[in-house]
Amino acid sequence: MAASFLTMDNSRTRQNMNGSANWSQQSGRTSTSSLEDLEIPKFRSFAPSSISISPSLVSPSTCFSPSLFLDSPAFVSSSANVLASPTTGALITNVTNQKGINEGDKSNNNNFNLFDFSFHTQSSGVSAPTTTTTTTTTTTTTNSSIFQSQEQQKKNQSEQWSQTETRPNNQAVSYNGREQRKGEDGYNWRKYGQKQVKGSENPRSYYKCTFPNCPTKKKVERSLEGQITEIVYKGSHNHPKPQSTRRSSSSSSTFHSAVYNASLDHNRQASSDQPNSNNSFHQSDSFGMQQEDNTTSDSVGDDEFEQGSSIVSRDEEDCGSEPEAKRWKGDNETNGGNGGGSKTVREPRIVVQTTSDIDILDDGYRWRKYGQKVVKGNPNPRSYYKCTTIGCPVRKHVERASHDMRAVITTYEGKHNHDVPAARGSGYATNRAPQDSSSVPIRPAAIAGHSNYTTSSQAPYTLQMLHNNNTNTGPFGYAMNNNNNNSNLQTQQNFVGGGFSRAKEEPNEETSFFDSFMP
């Protein structure tokens, strides 16, 4: 009885176990199919194919139910790895679906990223030298391209300067912000003026070519920042470009000697054209005569023209914005314009140096002072004069030497086209010989009664000198009338030529006293 009861009980237990196993398999398939449809990470739980269960010695409790055990949240979560509700234990299908999709995507991405990371880590070590080589090659190519662009820019700039030389006169050349050089076109320029023109806030500077007899000039306008905005060339160069803008001392001395020789030849040619001037002009011991080359100077003090300084005559009109209107008139204008409107041969300058305590030297002509300035290299001011005769182009400037304060340097330019005016209050005009007004040279005369000239040209009279005088011509060029002791003593001395002579002197009482003892 007891054995049969145990057999029945065991068979029932086996049936329950088989039923629970079959139910678990079906529920597993159902949950697996539903989870596959919801794209939840696949996890299959398989029941063992054969379970060897030994017959239990104790009868299971009636309160134990396999269905309750299978429906418990712990079993579902462990078997399907799906989160359940903490209160009811039921599956949350929507949340589980969304979370399953996201987790599936993340797991796939993580797997792919891990694969990519390992793969790229391995390949990066191999491809690193190639990348470095490419960078070096790119840098070298960039440097070569920059060098080529710089060479091309220099070539374009040189072509632009070469094209500038062939431009017509008075054509403006504009510059951008990167071409702010000081007009480096290969020629040597000298600045001779600067001023502010109307209608432009930029100052305008004036330059001329330093080559002898080259008429080329240019105007350069600069902005307030110092950038070149415009260059206007006037004229064309009649010489090739110099080889170097910086000459050595030997080449510079050779250049100046060549210029000096050319000026001497020019002066000899001008002197041969004017024989009357050469015959009537003589040098004196008290004067040092020299001629300056005037081929590269257009105005008074042009060589010492400083920036921002100018000399303007009060009676000259400013005919335009060009500084040529403020300069001296050319020889063609004074000679009636027979040169066809172009400057031909310029008169050389004549420099006279003498020693005097006063700056005003009486040379017989009348002058009017129109300017004064301090030039470079001499602390003493320079005064500018012009002849007061209407239509006379002669001008002069007077200054004291920098090495000797008593030495007065007078520079004349041009020649007078009129006679020497009569001295005020004297009959000088009636006693002088007529001269040809067409070729009257500049003859500086000494000051009457000046101490320097009296000591060098006169000596005290002695009785022996008077006894030895048996002719009408006394010593030192004095003409004396011995027959008439009471007549006036007339003295006349040609200082530098026949045109200038001393004024009449009053009778010398000492000489008249000595003449009274003559037989």
UniProtKB/Swiss-Prot annotation:
Q: Which InterPro entries match?
A: WRKY_dom, WRKY_dom_sf, WRKY_plant
Q: In which tissues is it expressed?
A: Highly expressed in roots, leaves and flowers, and at lower levels in stems, siliques and seeds.
Q: How is it modified after translation?
A: Phosphorylated by MPK4. Phosphorylated on serine residues by MPK3 and MPK6 following infection with the necrotrophic fungal pathogen B.cinerea.
Family, as annotated: Belongs to the WRKY group I family.
Low complexity bias spans? 130-142, 245-254
Its induction note reads: By salt stress. Induced by infection with the necrotrophic fungal pathogen B.cinerea. Induced by infection with the bacterial pathogen P.syringae pv. tomato DC3000.
Location of the region described as Disordered in the Swiss-Prot/TrEMBL record: 1-34, 123-212, 232-255, 267-349
How the protein assembles, per its UniProt entry? Interacts with MKS1. Interacts with ATG18A. Interacts with SIB1 and SIB2. Interacts with VQ1 and VQ10.
Q: Which organism is it from?
A: Arabidopsis thaliana
Q: Which GO terms describe its cellular component?
A: nucleus
DNA-binding region(s) in UniProt: 178-242, 356-421
Q: Which GO terms describe its biological process?
A: camalexin biosynthetic process; cellular heat acclimation; cellular response to heat; defense response to bacterium; defense response to fungus; positive regulation of autophagy; response to cold; response to heat
Q: What's its job?
A: Transcription factor. Interacts specifically with the W box (5'-TTGAC[CT]-3'), a frequently occurring elicitor-responsive cis-acting element. Involved in defense responses. Required for resistance to the necrotrophic fungal pathogen B.cinerea. Regulates the antagonistic relationship between defense pathways mediating responses to the bacterial pathogen P. syringae and the necrotrophic pathogen B.cinerea. Required for the phytoalexin camalexin synthesis following infection with B.cinerea.
Location in the cell: Nucleus
Q: Gene encoding this polypeptide?
A: WRKY33
Per UniProt, Zn(2+) binds at 209, 214, 237, 239, 387, 392, 416, 418
The domain of life for this entry's organism is: Eukaryota
Instruction: Kindly provide the name given to this protein in its UniProt entry.
Output: Probable WRKY transcription factor 33
Which Pfam families does the UniProt entry name for this protein? Answer: WRKY
Compositionally biased residues, Basic and acidic residues: 178-188, 323-332
Q: Can you name one GO molecular function term for this protein? A: transcription cis-regulatory region binding
UniProt xrefs under SMART domains? WRKY
Regions of compositional bias (Polar residues) in chain numbering: 7-34, 164-174, 269-299
Sorted alphabetically, the keyword list is: DNA-binding, Metal-binding, Nucleus, Phosphoprotein, Plant defense, Repeat, Stress response, Transcription, Transcription regulation, Zinc
In a knockout, what does one observe?
A: No visible phenotype under normal growth conditions, but mutant plants are extremely susceptible to the necrotrophic fungal pathogen B.cinerea.
Principal subcellular localization: nucleus
